[in-house]
């Protein structure tokens, strides 16, 4: 095997199989930047993860997902809120497989050569949403740079299938940046626009080369601005992680940039490193600072800001949308 097909992980040299799903060290071994480990910070008292309580729907949700061959970002990205969300019968569905074409060193979703799209996935997803009687659904995806439309057509198929079986269900999509395909993707999404359009900026532009290699801060901002121009009544949303080495002023500037590009809903949460191979946590932001970000968000004119250590983009997304003025029926 050629040397280009081998990678170093620690002191071992392993064969590289692009078809296999790579996680942690295996995933990050081939990125052009070096992840520099930092001092391991002690987790403060205000970082608390809620486990699933006995008698909740946690096991039922996992069983239904496996039966319908569905993935969730909750599982694939090792979200700390999975116990609480699954326990309450909610999940963020991740479509188009579990292998991402990007290798962002903050993210725990696996990397690899993606499998062909599952043509049954939209209807399997719709049946699952109907079976769980979900009133609000968040659909996200891995990056699919291998697809000519970036996967936008598959998003449309999923939205249309859900609306066919569950016409009252509100749908939020958390999309990738459709790098180089944004105009085509936005044109395709016009066939079935979501109820909320979400795309995360993730961090300050200074940190993009380290945190989001292959992505562009201005490109991401303009994706949401272009969508808003096409669908002025659909709320746009974006999220930021803190703790990657940014300053408070950089976060405030990202928020100003969001508002300048018409973004109405905001999430800010604490970055927690999935493993020692990922980007290290550079700081734990104090609750008082989160409150400051929240106050500033409303001063800037955001319709809703979910801000706190354990906040994630789709955490209590139904409540976020409702607080922003989108009508969401009470859960059945």
Curated annotation (Swiss-Prot):
- Organism per entry: Verminephrobacter eiseniae (strain EF01-2)
Catalytic activity, as annotated = [[Fe-S] cluster scaffold protein carrying a second [4Fe-4S](2+) cluster] + N(6)-octanoyl-L-lysyl-[protein] + 2 oxidized [2Fe-2S]-[ferredoxin] + 2 S-adenosyl-L-methionine + 4 H(+) = [[Fe-S] cluster scaffold protein] + N(6)-[(R)-dihydrolipoyl]-L-lysyl-[protein] + 4 Fe(3+) + 2 hydrogen sulfide + 2 5'-deoxyadenosine + 2 L-methionine + 2 reduced [2Fe-2S]-[ferredoxin]
SUPFAM superfamilies assigned to the protein according to its UniProt record, in alphabetical order: Radical SAM enzymes
> Which residues does the record give as [4Fe-4S] cluster 2 binding sites?
100, 104, 107
Looking up PROSITE patterns in the UniProt record yields: RADICAL_SAM
The primary site where this protein sits is cytoplasm
Q: What is this protein called?
A: Lipoyl synthase
What does this protein need as cofactor?
Answer: [4Fe-4S] cluster
Q: Extract one GO molecular function annotation from the record.
A: 4 iron, 4 sulfur cluster binding
Quote the record's binding site residues for [4Fe-4S] cluster 1: 74, 79, 85, 314
Its top-level enzyme class, in one word, is: transferase
Q: Where in the cell is it found?
A: Cytoplasm
- Chain ranges passing through the membrane: none
EC number, UniProt record = 2.8.1.8
The protein's matches in InterPro entries, at most eight in alphabetical order, are given as: Aldolase_TIM, Elp3/MiaA/NifB-like_rSAM, LIAS_N, Lipoyl_synth, rSAM
Pathway named in the protein's UniProt entry: Protein modification; protein lipoylation via endogenous pathway; protein N(6)-(lipoyl)lysine from octanoyl-[acyl-carrier-protein]: step 2/2
Q: Which GO terms describe its cellular component?
A: cytoplasm
Q: How is the cofactor bound?
A: Binds 2 [4Fe-4S] clusters per subunit. One cluster is coordinated with 3 cysteines and an exchangeable S-adenosyl-L-methionine.
The similarity comment for this entry is: Belongs to the radical SAM superfamily. Lipoyl synthase family.
Protein keywords: 4Fe-4S, Cytoplasm, Iron, Iron-sulfur, Metal-binding, S-adenosyl-L-methionine, Transferase
Q: Domain named Radical SAM core: which ranges?
A: 85-303
């Amino acid at each position: 095997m050629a040397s280009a097909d081998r990678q170093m992980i620690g002191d071992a040299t392993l064969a590289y199989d692009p078809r296999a799903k790579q996680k942690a060290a295996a995933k990050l071994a081939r990125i052009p930047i070096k992840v520099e480990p930092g001092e391991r910070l002690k987790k403060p008292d205000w970082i608390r993860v809620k486990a699933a309580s006995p008698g909740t729907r946690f096991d039922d949700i996992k069983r239904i997902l496996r039966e319908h061959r569905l993935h969730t970002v909750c599982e694939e990205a090792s979200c700390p809120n999975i116990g609480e969300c699954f326990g309450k019968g909610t999940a963020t569905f991740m479509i188009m497989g579990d292998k991402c074409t990007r290798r962002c060193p903050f993210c725990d979703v696996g990397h690899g050569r993606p499998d062909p799209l599952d043509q049954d996935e939209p209807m399997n997803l719709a049946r699952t949403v109907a079976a769980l009687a979900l009133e609000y659904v968040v659909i996200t995806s891995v990056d699919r740079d291998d697809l000519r439309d970036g996967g936008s057509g598959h998003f449309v198929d999923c939205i249309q299938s859900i609306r066919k079986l569950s016409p009252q269900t509100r749908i939020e999509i958390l999309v990738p940046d459709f790098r180089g395909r944004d105009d085509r993707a936005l044109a395709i999404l016009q066939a079935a626009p979501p109820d909320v359009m979400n795309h995360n900026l993730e961090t300050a532009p200074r940190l993009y080369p380290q945190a989001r290699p292959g992505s562009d801060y201005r490109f991401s901002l303009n994706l949401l601005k272009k969508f808003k121009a096409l669908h002025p009544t659909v709320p746009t949303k974006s999220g930021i992680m803190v703790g990657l080495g940014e300053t408070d002023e950089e976060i405030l500037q990202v928020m100003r940039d969001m508002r300048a590009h018409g973004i109405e809903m905001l999430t800010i949460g604490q970055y927690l490193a999935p493993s020692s191979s990922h980007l290290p946590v550079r700081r734990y932001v104090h609750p008082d600072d989160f409150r400051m970000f929240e106050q500033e968000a409303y001063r800037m004119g955001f319709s809703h800001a979910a801000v706190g250590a354990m906040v994630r983009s789709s955490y209590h997304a139904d409540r976020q949308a409702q607080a922003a003025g989108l009508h969401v029926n009470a859960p059945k």
